[in-house]
Amino acid sequence: MREKVYLKFEEMPKVYYNVLADLPFELDPPLDPETNKPISPEKLLAIFPEPLLEQEVSKERFIPIPEPVLKEYAVYRPTPLVRATFLEEYLRTRTKIYYKYEGVSPTGSHKVNTAIAQAYYNKIAGTKTLVTETGAGQWGSALSYAGQKFGLDVRIFMVKVSYQQKPFRKILMNLFGGDVQPSPSNLTQIGRQFSEDHPGTLGIAISEAIHTVLNEKDAKYSLGSVLNHVLLHQTIIGLEMKKQLEIIGIKPDIIVACHGGGSNFGGSALPFIPDVLSGKNIKIVAVEPESCPSLTKGEYRYDFGDTAGLTPLMKMYTLGKDFVPPAIHAGGLRYHGASPIVSKLYHERLIDAASVTQEEVFEAGKLFAKLEGIVPAPESAHAIAYVIKEAKKGDKESIVFTLSGHGYFDLNAYINQ
């Protein structure tokens, strides 16, 4: 029989986990680029609502999930933990492989977890319009869905290469009421600085979104990754995963998730950091593209989160704000930087990181689709590629990874491989 672990809604976590409460060190604060001193909350209020800024700096271990957010989560959560038995048999490995499947969400990825929370907190703060960026379109789809749930207008700058590669993502965003523009665009002074054939980057799209917010009343910026409060909302993944593993008596040797800005990886990994700190033998691995290796080849220093330098300076692993990654199909991982939390954990060697090639990614994705019956998003297939390498060794009892989304909007990528 297929081994699947489902939680009842009543068993779903009713709180988010804040890893900042348990870390034995402080994060370096975001800096105001004008003064190189810690940025004032007043400046951040120009782009973020107060409730989310409070979460950004909170040291409370657990943050209650509001009832309206839980109500929306009930549409698709808790998500299943599944044993990949067909993959195990194919690899002839003694290692048990489990995956936490986030592709059952309304838009097909983990991004909805924070989109719903951010839409709710913006709504109660009086925001009328949310402006954001998106790479592969997963985040833009999620925020469009969440925005219409809470009566907010949503405007999206989508990285141009992904806008061209993934036309059905645009249709989905439009279906949920989102207004989507390719970035660089001619709508902002920042976008107009780039040539028409520029592929775009998440850094440029972020700049265009923030520029729009700063020039529009009742609009706030919404980010789908990197920031503390985003990873906080995503910890519902790891908290559920922990409960599900306890039910079947599995103590994972390795926990794996793909890494771009850090939302999926952080959400999966952070609830297990207390176990690492207490000395338990768990290896936690962030897997990124070889062509955009922020953690494995980046520098740990202060840098802007966007190309134009409109964000505060953040201490993180970075390839540089002007880095233009190749036009790979995993658009959600084409980011020059990384979450400050994930960066600090990696710097302190509490987590590991690895990179894989696009060829390895699509080989793994195709294999997983044939064996397990789910076409993984190219981003998620990075984790699968790493898991396959590790499972072939056969020296671990169990590996758990997060399948952060399905790839049914990314089939063009599979055709071209």
Swiss-Prot record:
Subunit organization: Tetramer of two alpha and two beta chains.
CDD domains named in the record: Trp-synth_B (cd06446)
Nucleotide-binding recorded as keyword: no
Family, as annotated: Belongs to the TrpB family.
Name this polypeptide is given: Tryptophan synthase beta chain
Keyword annotations: Amino-acid biosynthesis, Aromatic amino acid biosynthesis, Lyase, Pyridoxal phosphate, Tryptophan biosynthesis
Record's catalysed reaction(s): (1S,2R)-1-C-(indol-3-yl)glycerol 3-phosphate + L-serine = D-glyceraldehyde 3-phosphate + L-tryptophan + H2O
Assigned EC number: 4.2.1.20
Annotated organism of origin: Fervidobacterium nodosum (strain ATCC 35602 / DSM 5306 / Rt17-B1)
Entry's Gene Ontology molecular function annotations: L-serine hydro-lyase (adding indole, L-tryptophan-forming) activity; pyridoxal phosphate binding; tryptophan synthase activity
PANTHER family referenced in this protein's UniProt entry, alphabetically: TRYPTOPHAN SYNTHASE, TRYPTOPHAN SYNTHASE-RELATED
Pathway: Amino-acid biosynthesis; L-tryptophan biosynthesis; L-tryptophan from chorismate: step 5/5
Function text: The beta subunit is responsible for the synthesis of L-tryptophan from indole and L-serine.
A UniProt-annotated Pfam family: PALP
